[in-house]
From Swiss-Prot:
Cited Gene3D superfamilies: 1.10.287.70, EF-hand, Voltage-gated potassium channels. Chain C
Species classification: Eukaryota, Viridiplantae, Streptophyta, Embryophyta, Tracheophyta
Positions on the Extracellular side per record topology: 98-125, 183, 230-248, 264-286, 453-470, 523-531, 582-618, 634-654
Pfam families: Ion_trans
GO process annotations (BP): calcium ion transport; defense response
Protein's organism: Nicotiana tabacum (Common tobacco)
Cytoplasmic side: 1-76, 147-161, 203-208, 308-431, 492-501, 550-560, 676-735
Gene designation per UniProt: TPC1B
Bilayer topology: Multi-pass membrane protein
Record localization: Membrane
Function: Functions as a voltage-gated inward-rectifying Ca(2+) channel (VDCC) across the plasma membrane that mediates sucrose-induced Ca(2+) influx in autotrophically grown leaf cells. Acts as the major ROS-responsive Ca(2+) channel and is the possible target of Al-dependent inhibition. Plays a regulatory role in defense responses.
Protein name: Two pore calcium channel protein 1B
Assembly notes: Homodimer.
Intramembrane segments: 249-263, 619-633
Gene Ontology CC terms: monoatomic ion channel complex; plant-type vacuole; vacuolar membrane
Activity control note: Inhibited by Al(3+), La(3+) and Gd(3+). Up-regulated by H(2)O(2), cryptogein, salicylic acid (SA) and cold shock.
Length: 735
């Protein structure tokens, strides 16, 4: 299916080839290496989507700045963990309404229908906030050391982070010093800022919100047109049904009619809302059918089309900006090699670059004749030299066609043992297909065992105990599999694969959980009850989905599904952050209203539908409630009930705005993106099956673009394929 840069030789063929000497760290290469070592490291950085500010690349203190930059990035895991902790704090923080003088303490969870997550005490919360704030300050301000204050402050993003950091510090100080009784409406800005910092420092999330900000004007315009349609339809319905049973019972005023017609626009109260009119005359259904058809199948889809068109325009700008950043980094690498400053590289210079790139990518050993054929193929102008554009194509081909070089396993410290004949034979077996077939067989047997154990459990059969022990044995078999793979590949190389990360986490949770289940006292019901282990075992067997990749008719669909998951993560993360914002707002507006002692609660639809657990009294419950509203399951129940409990129609603004942002905007955006991304993936799969019939230009395009290795590269390639015509126009407009 793939056509390799070297005829008849795959990049994977030399994956196990060991090189003499140590692998050069690109941090050291940029800071202290030769011109070719620096250029190779910059090429690797560019293909990984990492870029240094352009002013640093062109500055005299480039090496020192790069050294500080890479020292900073060594702690990326710590920074990411801290931002995750900021969001997690919202889930465990005690709600502000609990600090008021209440007739019943909020420690009475049943009284307030609270969730099961424990609240942090005041001291614990303060320590948590203090530690995360300290790490946040270091992460935000450290870039000044390698960018310099002037360059750092020139960035709008950096200025925004510093301003928000000062606001967060002020919020914490005020919260500590002022008593809770000072607030008429308990309010803190910290829960919102934590999510904002999470967004600003996760690049994919930040890019998604920047795209949404760019298309906000277009979205508001189309929403305004939809509002005119709703206002006119509601007025028409109010006048038309004024003297009917519908007007006397449901459309009693224009405001009520507008509310009911808006809910009907979402189809949540269809056909309940127009049953009175239907009882009077069956012909009245024509009005409502026409309204639903126009609203749902025309206006909503019109919004979808306009929103997605605006989204693509903003996405093109963002992808083009990333391409320009990558090109600037490659331009710096090109200038390091082009010592004569004539804008061209000859064959010898490219050969030296390939040798240095071997330290970062897995490349076959290239003979002189082989390299000449590669050089001639990449030399589009035919002048036996490569310019910057051709150099960028070369780097793209390397980045897409070849995998990252494996790091040396820790076991290399004992070479006599690790490279003994027995060890080499074992590692060869683990790398082979036979070992994978054995694991698949174990998974299938495990699946049968789970089915039998589940069936016996449902039947309350005593034989279930035996099969639980069998499942326990399977858990340790997976540990052995994991240990063998770590021994063979090294942990860093093992962890690089997404499936291995999933297996590693689930396997250890299963084993620790099963062990705890067997040794825990019976009075600890949650630990001694092994029911939850079964679901983890079922999750472990999701690996069987990959078997479908070997079935021709399913391969394209499964491959597309696996590629779409990382493509969608930024947009799903955007919805999660919107839920966080609205959850914090919901806690501060509606917190504590739903409780057993509220006399108005029994008359609401929340009580009538047994929805009392879905409330805004704590963060976990609030997130679940917003999810229910997001999927439009009787969402008007919460809107109307909280309006009755608060006694103000301003409650509608909270729920209507959530609908406009999350459902009408973001969910429609995701649906449209999935449709186009799926079509793009199917096109790529079809083109891959037609290699033999393609012309030379198409082959060259695939040579430069297919075969992505990492998740980010797959997503980047998919976006470039989806937006190829728009990106071409953009590049023509901005030469």
């Amino acid at each position: 299916m793939e056509e390799y840069l070297l005829p008849g030789e795959s990049s994977n063929s030399c994956r196990t080839r060991r090189r003499s000497g140590s692998i050069f760290d690109r941090r050291d290469a940029i800071a202290h290496g030769s011109a070719y070592q620096k250029a190779a490291a910059l090429v690797d950085l560019a293909e990984d989507g990492i870029g240094l500010p352009e002013e640093i690349l062109e500055g005299a203190s480039f090496e020192k700045a790069a050294e500080l930059y890479f020292m900073f990035t060594r702690f990326d895991f710590l920074w990411s963990l801290n931002y995750l902790a900021l969001v997690v704090l919202n889930f465990f923080e005690k709600p502000l309404w609990c600090s008021k003088h209440l007739a019943e303490s909020c420690n009475n969870r049943d009284y307030y229908y609270l969730g099961e997550l424990p609240f942090l005490t005041g001291a614990e919360s303060l320590i948590f906030e203090g530690v995360t704030l300290l790490l946040l300050i270091i992460h935000i301000l450290f870039p000044i050391s390698y960018e310099g204050f002037n360059l750092y402050w020139r960035s709008l993003l950096n200025r925004l982070k510093v301003i928000l950091l000062l606001i967060l510090v002020a919020d914490i100080v005020v919260y500590i010093l002022l008593p809770a009784d000072f607030y008429y409406l308990p309010f803190r800005i910290a829960p919102y800022l934590r999510v904002v910092f999470f967004i600003l420092n996760i690049r994919e999330l930040r890019d998604s919100f920047f795209i949404l900000a760019g298309m906000l004007g277009t979205y508001l315009n189309v929403v305004a047109l939809s509002a005119l349609f709703l206002l006119f339809s509601s007025w028409l319905a109010y006048v038309f049904f004024e003297d009917t049973r519908q007007g006397k019972t449901t459309f009693t005023s224009y405001g009520t009619t507008l509310y009911q017609m808006f809910v009907l626009f979402t189809t949540s109260n269809n056909p309940d809302v127009w049953i009175p009119a239907y009882k009077d005359s069956r012909w009245y259904c024509l009005f409502f059918v026409l309204y639903v058809l126009l609203g749902v199948y025309f206006v909503t889809n019109l919004i979808l089309a306009v929103v997605y068109d605006s989204f693509k325009s903003e996405l093109v700008k963002q992808v083009a900006d990333k391409d320009r950043l990558r090109l600037r980094t490659l331009k710096k690498a090109f200038s390091l090699i082009d010592e004569a400053n004539n804008g061209l590289l000859n064959e010898k210079q490219c050969t030296l670059l390939f040798e240095e790139l071997n330290k970062y990518r897995t490349l076959p050993k290239i003979s002189g004749d082989d390299f000449k054929s590669i050089f001639n193929e990449l030399d589009d102008t035919g002048d036996f030299k490569i310019n910057l554009e051709e150099f960028a194509d070369l780097c793209s081909a390397i980045g897409l066609r070849f995998q990252k070089e494996d790091s040396l396993p820790i076991f290399e410290a004992c070479p006599n043992f690790y490279h003994s004949p027995a060890s080499e034979k074992l590692r060869g077996f683990i790398r082979g297909a036979t070992f994978e077939y054995i694991i698949v067989f174990v998974l299938l047997v495990n699946l049968v065992a789970v089915i039998i154990e589940t069936t016996l459990d449902i039947q309350n059969n005593s034989g279930q105990t035996f099969w639980q022990k069998v499942e326990f044995t399977f858990g340790w078999l997976y540990v052995i599999e994991m240990a063998l793979k770590v021994y063979t590949y090294g942990f860093e190389n093992y962890w690089r694969d997404g499936q291995n990360r999933f297996d590693f986490i689930v396997t250890w949770v299963i084993v620790i959980g099963e062990t705890t289940t067997f040794v825990a006292p019976d009075d600890l019901t949650f630990l001694s009850n092994g029911e939850w282990i079964r679901y983890l075992l079922i999750a472990r067997m999701l690996r069987l989905i990959r078997l479908l990749m070997h079935v021709e008719r399913y391969r394209a669909f499964v491959a597309t599904f696996l590629t779409l998951i990382p493509s969608l993560m930024p947009y799903l993360g955007t919805i999660f952050c919107i839920l966080c914002f609205y959850c914090s707002l919901g806690l501060q507006i509606f917190g504590g209203i739903v409780n057993t002692g509220n006399p108005n609660l029994a008359q609401t639809d929340l009580a009538g539908n047994d929805y009392l657990l879905f409330n805004f009294n704590d963060y976990p419950n609030g997130m679940v409630t917003l999810f229910n509203i997001l999927v439009m399951g009787n969402w008007q129940v919460w809107m109307q009930s909280y309006k009755e409990l608060t006694g103000t129609s301003w409650t509608y603004a909270y729920f209507v705005s959530f609908y406009l942002i999350s459902v009408l905007w973001l969910l429609n955006l995701i649906v449209a993106f999935v449709l186009e991304a799926f079509q793009a993936e199917m096109d790529l799969e079809a083109s891959a099956r037609c290699v033999d019939g393609d012309d030379k230009e198409a082959k060259r395009e695939r040579r430069r673009n297919v075969g992505t290795k990492t998740r980010s590269q797959r997503v980047d390639f998919l976006l470039h394929h989806m937006l190829r015509s728009e990106l071409t126009e953009c590049s023509n407009d901005n030469p």
